UniProtKB/Swiss-Prot annotation:
Family: Belongs to the junctophilin family.
GO biological process, one term: regulation of release of sequestered calcium ion into cytosol by sarcoplasmic reticulum
Tissue specificity as recorded in UniProt: Specifically expressed in brain.
Stretches with biased composition (Low complexity): 231-244
Record bears the keyword Transmembrane: yes
Comp. bias (Basic and acidic residues): 639-649
Annotated function: Junctophilins contribute to the formation of junctional membrane complexes (JMCs) which link the plasma membrane with the endoplasmic or sarcoplasmic reticulum in excitable cells. Provides a structural foundation for functional cross-talk between the cell surface and intracellular calcium release channels. JPH3 is brain-specific and appears to have an active role in certain neurons involved in motor coordination and memory.
Gene3D superfamilies xrefs: Histone H3 K4-specific methyltransferase SET7/9 N-terminal domain (2.20.110.10)
Name of the protein in question: Junctophilin-3
Entry GO terms, CC: endoplasmic reticulum membrane; junctional membrane complex; junctional sarcoplasmic reticulum membrane; membrane; plasma membrane
Note on domains (UniProt): The MORN (membrane occupation and recognition nexus) repeats contribute to the plasma membrane binding, possibly by interacting with phospholipids.
Topology relative to the membrane: Peripheral membrane protein; Single-pass type IV membrane protein
Modification Phosphoserine occurs at: S440, S457, S475, S506, S703, S710
Length: 748
């Protein structure tokens, strides 16, 4: 004996209807958590049998169930997409039809695990079709792609995809995914026609015409481009030139052909190799019959246009790649080896006969394989047509099942109201989030000429992007919060234009003097060098004070241990204002030796590693006058000193610009004197002398070559040696040209 009533779940959902032995039985309504999501229909001992399930997004399923999953036959509405057909344990299949209500794009055939698999027919928004084999939601195996007339073909404007291939996937709630990132025609233009991939010219000619007057490659590259030119120039056909019949097998692009492509930049030529064929008749159609791999024309196949243009041979990623033969409308042929639509080997003069015969044999084998593949593809297309008709029959049965499910849902609502009159139903018996009106199916491509801009055919499920079609259990789907996005690292604090410096003193244990240096910072801030912290025992790290103060330099962050960590280099590259100039001075004084001096030397080398440094030499102040030599930069140097190796400034090599230009050497001025007066102390009985390091920091310049300092007499030798460099360059270029010509004529 069955009874019924209302049961409220802890998560906010409820069931109202009949039950038996503590399980839902008969007709009833079950809502999900917080009243979102609903199943209305018939039940059998706790499981759904026939009814309507509505997701919180508004997507619906109307049909049969088994063991809590969609199983049998039914109709799913997901956005503008509607699937009608069979279901197996929650997945689409085995036979079914999926179509877009907006533009008529659809797939009819076999399914497996929710993806197109087996044989089927895909119809695109412009009316073009594909019949053949499918694997994992992609065209793979053998098939036939038939386009509509060129004037009616969909215009694809998306820069990401350049043909209407198989229909792509979408989210579970019916919202559109981004288009497939992999282009169907790699390197083809942003504007093309659906189903048209065969071009009547070689892409190398596009390069030549676009690069006229903008030759930016070397002579060897120019020879390579000329070598790979094809005789199938569209401009040659348009002007009725007969150059493609020449012995060399190369066409001559006329001035009119250059004018056709004169508006296209060189960058576009190299990046996209755009196909421009304005003379294609609006009634021209194109058919490809052959092999497919990963949703693209790959393998052996035959592509033919209704105007007589035909290619038989090997393909790779929708391009002629391998050996093949091209037949033109006037009956002439071009055969050889192609690489990404470019003819790289064919009938040319001065070729060794044995080599030419080998190419001919490979071309013949490729043509035969393409013809065999075309025959198999036609057979597979016939099988796909039979699967399509069977799928349509299942779709009709699904419509009938959907109508029965709606009737069961109506009875379930009446039953629920009888058991619990207070049971409220909102929004057709459901409290859910009404989805926003979708204006697109799945595609951002648009379309046919002669009609306003409209959405192109959305694409069906694809491998790797197909959402889960699993049927929820007794309760509807729950929405899970997405994890927060990773917080980007804070940008380094910009250097203050008004620099503040503090003076720090250490001991030079080698010379027995103090070393003073100016450090950037404010009064009271922690020092940036870690050697001072080691003296304090390392109890206080620089990170705690400096990070809060925001005074860390962009290039380094120091730890209490004295080791440096590289910062983010990108802000330093974008910085436009030059950093302040640091000047470090050193005085020889009588003081005690300490290990702090050696640590300071290491720190100074680390701080100088990211800067280009101009280091002026030591100056010794003697009682008698000295001879001075003036360099080109205007800096004064003493010649009477016997410099020691360590006087070069803590192991940092002096660097000079080879060009000795004004950017590297700033002449001394009144505002910035080259020599500063510093108090000196006597060390025992030694003569008074002054040692000074003047370090000028500037950001590294990428374009300026750096070389060791040279004297004026060495400059004359450099001028004489550099005069022969252009001669050597010219000789090397001429030698390379000769080798290339020999290679082209005798070895290819």
């Amino acid at each position: 004996m069955s009874s019924g009533g209302r049961f409220n779940f802890d998560d906010g959902g409820s069931y109202c209807g009949g039950w038996e032995d503590g399980k839902a039985h008969g007709h009833g309504v079950c809502t999900g958590p917080k009243g979102q999501g609903e199943y209305t229909g018939s039940w059998s001992h706790g499981f759904e049998v026939l009814g309507v399930y509505t997701w919180p997004s508004g997507n619906t399923y109307q049909g049969t169930w088994a063991q809590g999953k969609r199983h049998g036959i039914g109709l799913e509405s997901k956005g503008k997409w509607v699937y009608k057909g069979e279901w197996t344990h929650g997945f689409k299949g085995r036979y079914g039809v999926r179509e877009c209500a907006g533009n008529g794009a659809k797939y009819e055939g076999t399914w497996s695990n929710g993806l197109q698999d087996g044989y089927g027919t895909e119809t695109y928004s412009d009316g073009g079709t594909y019949q053949g084999q499918w694997v994992g939601g992609m065209r793979q195996g053998y098939g036939v792609r038939q386009s509509v007339p060129y004037g009616m073909a969909a215009v694809i404007r998306s820069p990401l995809r350049t043909s209407i291939n198989s229909l792509r996937s979408e989210h579970t709630n019916g919202t559109a995914l981004h288009p497939d990132a992999s282009p169907a025609v790699a390197g083809s233009p942003a504007v093309s026609r659906g189903g048209f991939v065969l071009v009547a010219h070689s892409d190398s000619e596009i390069l030549k015409s676009k690069k006229k007057g903008l030759f930016r490659r070397s002579l060897l590259s120019g020879l390579k481009l000329r070598k790979s030119e094809s005789k199938s120039s569209l401009a040659s056909q348009r002007s009725k030139q007969s150059s493609f019949r020449s012995e060399a097998g190369m066409s001559t692009v006329s001035s009119t052909a250059s004018d056709i492509h004169s508006t296209i930049s060189l960058g576009e030529a190299e990046a996209e190799l755009a196909v421009i064929e304005d003379d294609i008749d609006a009634t021209t159609t194109e058919t490809y019959v052959g092999e497919w791999k990963n949703d693209k024309r790959s393998g052996f196949g035959v592509s033919q246009r209704s105007d007589g243009l035909k290619y038989e041979g090997e393909w790779a990623s929708n391009r002629r790649h391998g050996y093949g033969c091209m037949t033109f409308p006037d009956g002439t042929k071009e055969e050889g080896k192609y690489k990404q639509n470019i003819l790289v080997g064919g009938k040319r003069k001065n070729l060794i006969p044995l080599r030419a015969s080998k190419i001919r044999e490979k071309v013949d084998r490729a043509v035969e394989a393409a013809e065999r593949a075309a025959t198999i593809a036609k057979q597979k297309a016939e099988i796909a047509a039979s699967r399509t008709s069977h799928s349509r029959a299942k779709a009709e049965a699904a419509l009938t099942a959907a109508q029965k499910a709606q009737e069961e849902a109506r009875i379930a609502r009446i039953t629920a109201k009888e058991f619990s009159p207070s049971f409220q139903h909102r929004e057709n018996g459901l409290e859910y989030q009404r989805p926003k009106r979708q204006t697109s199916c799945d595609d951002i491509e648009v379309l046919s000429t002669g009609t306003p801009l409209q959405q192109e055919s959305p694409e069906l499920y694809r491998k790797g992007t197909t959402p889960s079609d699993l049927t929820p259990d007794d309760s509807p789907l729950q929405s899970f919060p997405t994890s927060p996005a990773a917080t980007p690292p804070p940008a380094p604090a910009a250097r203050n234009k008004v620099a503040h410096f503090s003076r720090q003193v250490s001991v030079d244990e080698e010379r027995g003097g103090d070393i003073q240096m100016l450090l950037e910072g404010r009064a009271g801030d922690c020092a940036r060098s870690s050697w001072g912290e080691e003296q304090a025992g390392g109890s206080r790290g620089v990170r705690s004070g400096a990070l809060r103060g925001g005074l860390l330099v962009d290039d380094f962050r120091t730890r209490g241990s004295g080791r440096k960590q590289p910062g983010n280099p990108k802000p330093r590259e974008r910085r436009t204002e030059s950093p302040p100039v640091f000047t470090w001075t050193s005085h020889h004084r009588a003081s005690n030796h300490s290990p702090g001096g050696s640590r300071l030397l290491e720190l100074q080398e680390e701080k100088l590693s990211n800067y280009r440094m101009e280091m002026k030499p030591l100056l010794r102040m003697e009682t008698h006058p000295q001879k001075r030599r003036y360099s080109k930069g205007g800096a004064c140097r003493g010649l009477g000193d016997d410099h020691r190796p360590e006087d070069r400034g803590f192991g940092v090599q002096r660097l000079r610009s080879k060009a000795q230009n004004k950017e590297n050497f700033r002449p001394a001025s009144s505002a910035e004197p080259a020599v500063q007066k510093l108090a000196s102390l006597r060390l025992g009985g030694a003569e008074p002398r002054l040692l000074r390091w003047d370090l000028t920091f500037s950001p590294p310049q990428k374009s300026l070559p750096v070389a060791l300092e040279s004297d004026e007499e060495n400059g004359d030798e450099l001028k004489s040696s550099t005069g022969s460099a252009p001669i050597l360059v010219v000789m090397v270029i001429l030698l390379n040209i000769g080798v290339a010509i020999l290679f082209i004529n005798f070895f290819i």
